[in-house]
Amino acid sequence: MTDPRSALPNVFTNISAREIDFVTRFTDNWEALREVLGIMRPIRKAPGTKLVSYTASVQLEDGDVPEGAIIPYSKATVVEAAKGDLTIQKYAKAVTIEDVNKYGAAIAVQKTDDAFLNELQSTVLDSFYDFLTDDTSAITATYSTFQMGVAMAIGKVRDKFKRMRKNASSVVVFVNTLDAYEYLGAAELTVQTLFGIDYVKNFMGADTMILSSEIEAGTIIAVPTDNIVLYYIDPGDSEFAQLGLNYAVEGETNLIGFHAEGNYNTAVGASFALMGMSLWAEYADAIAIITVDDTP
């Protein structure tokens, strides 16, 4: 009699195929999210790289200079505003032989791989939210309505980029999920979902509005997409391999490494993920953090 489990889809009998599937899906998801956010391609950095955000300003002198006179220097000021380390994050999960026996490999392995992948994606965005809200150089203000808060958040970062003589080609706005739905309840707008991330396109001047429960209620954050950079460490770095750690990577941009193996001592299927990714804002003072408070 044929084992009915053999007919189930997505059962990887080859560990290498499962590893490649995992890293390919992760990379494809991030590529799609990058396009939604409108940010440029990821930039590879060496392990231990220091990430720095700046504030920048120029005090322009008069350009009407008499013939033969010394041209006065315009004062340019660049100040380091925030620092961070681009570090390696290490994750592991295990599926027991009992779970495979109870549910079958298609559920016990594949479903937990899916959940593992989603959590790894979310941790990068969550860290970015923390970075944005902890920024003491950000533009801050308070408005009485959600609509005004969104509009002014966008306006303030566009104005900042204009005064920096930079082009804010598009702006992404981050808002609390319930705040957005409360406002959107009366509006005919389509909320789209990409790998568990809810967003609205072309809303009130924002090219993309990200809805997240990680953003505090009453808080609106706006960032020009030209101010967002995704840095990463290549998990396939040859120096890691010298430790005997060989992670599967896939594609031109190796954002994550994945390795799966069986552990006979505990009778589990162990999976290991290695990544070093950080979304970063280059100019700390080109971020707007708006508080919505309708208290009279």
Regions found by a protein language model. Give the residues of each.
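Generic hydrophobic, helix-prone segments enriched in Leu/Val/Ile
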Residues: 7, 22-29, 43, 47, ...
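Assembly/oligomerization interface modules of large self-assembling protein complexes
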Residues: 18-90
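Residues at beta-strand starts and edge strands
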Residues: 89-91, 169, 265-267
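Alpha-helical scaffold segments that mediate packing/assembly in large oligomeric complexes
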Residues: 92, 96-166, 289-296
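Short, intrinsically disordered N-terminal pre-domain segments
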Residues: 1-24, 28, 294-296
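Extended, solvent-exposed, turn-rich assembly/linker loops in the middle of proteins
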Residues: 136-207
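Sequence/fold signature of self-assembling virion shell proteins
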Residues: 2-9, 43-50, 189-296
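Helix N-cap / beta->alpha transition motif
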Residues: 89-99, 173-179, 205, 211-213, ...
